[in-house]
Design a protein with these regions (language model features):
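Amphipathic alpha-helical segments of the small helical/lid subdomains adjacent to P-loop NTPase cores
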Residues: 1-40, 73
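Extended alpha-helical interface modules used as scaffolds for assembling large macromolecular complexes
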Residues: 32-260
C-alpha cells in the first residue's frame, strides 16, 4: 500500500490486491507478485504481466488432455468456485498423466492456485483450492480461447449461429466442432467410446464459459445419464434469450436415425 501511495495509486489498492495478491512464501501470506506489481506501477494498467512471461504449455496440455473431472474443476475455478482435494507434497512428473492430485499439486506449486482453507485429519491434509488471483483467471481464459480459435475455427461460427438462432448453421458447425475437438482433446490414451462424448462435452463447456462471459451465465448439469448432457445459458441482460442445449449420444444399435 505504501508503494501504491508513493506512485499516487492509493485508490487502486483493492484492484491491485484482486489482480496480483494471493501468493505465499514460507510463512509469509498475501504476497504480491513482484513482477506484475512492478509492471503495473510502470504502466498503470491492470494486465496479466506474469502470466504472459511463459507459454504455460505444460499447464495447458495437462488441462486440455486431462480427464473430464479435471475439466469440470476448471469450470468451477473459472466461475470463482473452490475445489477440495488432497495434495502431493512431492510432485512426480511421471504421475501427471494419470494422477489428478499431482496436477493440482503442480498448479499450486507453480502459483496458479492458492490454498483458501485446509484441514488435517488422520495425519492427512485436505486443501480447499481457488485460482490465485484475477491475473491467473485471465490467463486460463486466454488459454481456452486459444484452444478453440487455433484448432477448432468452426467453434466461433457455431457461437455466432447460436446467438442468431440459426439452427441450420448450428448443425453444420457443431458437426465440425465435434470432429475437430475429439482429436484435439485426445491424449493418445485411446479412451473408451463411452468416455469420448464426455471429453468433448466438458471441453465444449469450458469454451462456452470463456466465449460468453459477461453475456451469459453458463451452467451444466454434470450428469451424463442415458447419454444426455445439458447446458443452460442464462442471459445477464434482459435483451438476450435464455438458451438450453441438450446433447445426446447417438447409439446406432438403439436408434435408426438421430431424429428418433
Amino acid at each position: 500500500s505504501e508503494v501504491l501511495k508513493e506512485y499516487g495509486l492509493s485508490g487502486k489498492k483493492e484492484m491491485a490486491r484482486q489482480w496480483y495478491d494471493g501468493f505465499s512464501f514460507g510463512d509469509k501470506k498475501n504476497m504480491y507478485n513482484p513482477w506484475s506489481i512492478t509492471n503495473y506501477l510502470d504502466k498503470r494498467v491492470f494486465l496479466p504481466y506474469w502470466a504472459n512471461t511463459s507459454s504455460n504449455s505444460l499447464v495447458g496440455k495437462l488441462i486440455r488432455e486431462g480427464t473430464p473431472d479435471i475439466k469440470m474443476v476448471m469450470e468451477d475455478f473459472l466461475l470463482g468456485k473452490s475445489f477440495c482435494t488432497r495434495l502431493d507434497e512431492q510432485v512426480v512428473f511421471s504421475q501427471l498423466a494419470y494422477k489428478e492430485s499431482a496436477v493440482w499439486s503442480l498448479l499450486l506449486a507453480g502459483g496458479y492456485l492458492k490454498i483458501k482453507n485446509y484441514t488435517v485429519e488422520g495425519g492427512k491434509t485436505r486443501c480447499e483450492l481457488v485460482l490465485t488471483n484475477e491475473e491467473v483467471r485471465l490467463m486460463f481464459e486466454g488459454m481456452v480461447e486459444e484452444w478453440f480459435s487455433e484448432f477448432t475455427p468452426a467453434y466461433g461460427r457455431f457461437i455466432k449461429a447460436l446467438l442468431c438462432d440459426d439452427k441450420k448453421a448450428m448443425n453444420i458447425y457443431m458437426n465440425k466442432v465435434a470432429l475437430e475437438t475429439f482429436s484435439f482433446f485426445d491424449a493418445g490414451k485411446k479412451p473408451s467410446e463411452e468416455a469420448e462424448p464426455e471429453r468433448f462435452y466438458h471441453g465444449f463447456v469450458l469454451g462456452l464459459l470463456v466465449e460468453l462471459r459477461g453475456r451469459y451465465a453458463v451452467t451444466s448439469n454434470r450428469e451424463s445419464g442415458y447419454g444426455r448432457y445439458d447446458v443452460m445459458l442464462e442471459p445477464l441482460k434482459g435483451t438476450d434469450d435464455a438458451i438450453i442445449l441438450e446433447f445426446k449420444v447417438h447409439d446406432p444399435e438403439e436408434e435408426s436415425t438421430l431424429e428418433d
